[in-house]
């Protein structure tokens, strides 16, 4: 009798432990993109209120390739900051956009310049927030998907022949961007952005 009681108790304990483990896994998955459909993930990206990123940018011109490492911080309508980490000769340069004025500063060079009423504040094609705005306003924006990622595409309405199409890749499981390609009018990738670190809606 005691053996049966102990066996029943052991089975109940194992079921409880199994239930707790399953519950924790389901909570973890619900916090990421595991239970989200494609449109929910796209809506999540399009409605970001803030983010911080560390990105590697490769820019291909007609003559050469240049590589930069940047930090970006987007605070909605308040302030956007972009800081150069590499190359070392321009490291420390910060571009701060408050929505009206553009401030360029570099403590190493004792540089502090403010450009008031800057017309092209929204034209930083390296910025995720610029992609989001372009995607929202362009009726040709669309997406593709596969098992691991969602690929968002939009056309850039610009006279700049080197920036005509933007393609953003989103990891399904984390709901975070992994890379972005910016193509010219001949479909050549001119700018390739790799998202090394991403914090969203801090």
Task: Walk through the language-model features, giving the residues of each.
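Short, solvent-exposed coil/turn segments at beta-strand boundaries
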Residues: 47-52, 72-80, 96-101, 147, ...
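Gly/Pro-enriched, hydrophobic low-complexity segments
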Residues: 143-202
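N-terminal leader/targeting segments and the immediate start of mature chains
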Residues: 2-76, 202
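Beta-turn initiation residues at beta-strand->coil junctions
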Residues: 57-59, 84-87, 105-108, 156, ...
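An acidic-aromatic
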Residues: 71-126
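A short, amphipathic edge element
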Residues: 130-142
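Amphipathic hydrophobic-ligand
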Residues: 64-70, 91-97, 161-162, 188-191
């Amino acid at each position: 009798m005691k053996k049966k009681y102990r066996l029943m108790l052991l089975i109940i304990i194992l079921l409880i432990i199994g239930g707790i483990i399953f519950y924790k896994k389901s909570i973890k998955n619900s916090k990421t993109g595991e239970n989200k459909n494609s449109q929910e993930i796209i809506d999540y990206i399009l409605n970001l209120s803030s983010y911080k990123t560390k990105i590697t940018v490769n820019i291909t011109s007609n003559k050469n390739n240049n590589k930069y490492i940047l930090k970006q911080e987007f605070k909605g309508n308040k302030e956007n900051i972009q800081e150069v980490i590499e190359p070392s000769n321009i490291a420390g340069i910060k571009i701060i956009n408050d929505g009206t004025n553009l401030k360029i500063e570099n403590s190493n060079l004792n540089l502090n310049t403010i450009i008031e009423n800057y017309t092209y504040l929204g034209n930083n094609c390296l910025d995720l927030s610029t992609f989001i705005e372009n995607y929202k306003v362009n009726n040709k924006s669309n997406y593709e998907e596969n098992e691991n990622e969602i690929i968002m595409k939009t056309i850039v309405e610009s006279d700049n022949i080197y920036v005509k199409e933007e393609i953003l890749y989103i990891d399904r499981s984390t709901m975070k961007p992994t890379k972005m390609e910016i193509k010219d009018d001949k479909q050549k990738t001119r700018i390739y952005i790799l998202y090394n670190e991403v914090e969203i809606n801090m």
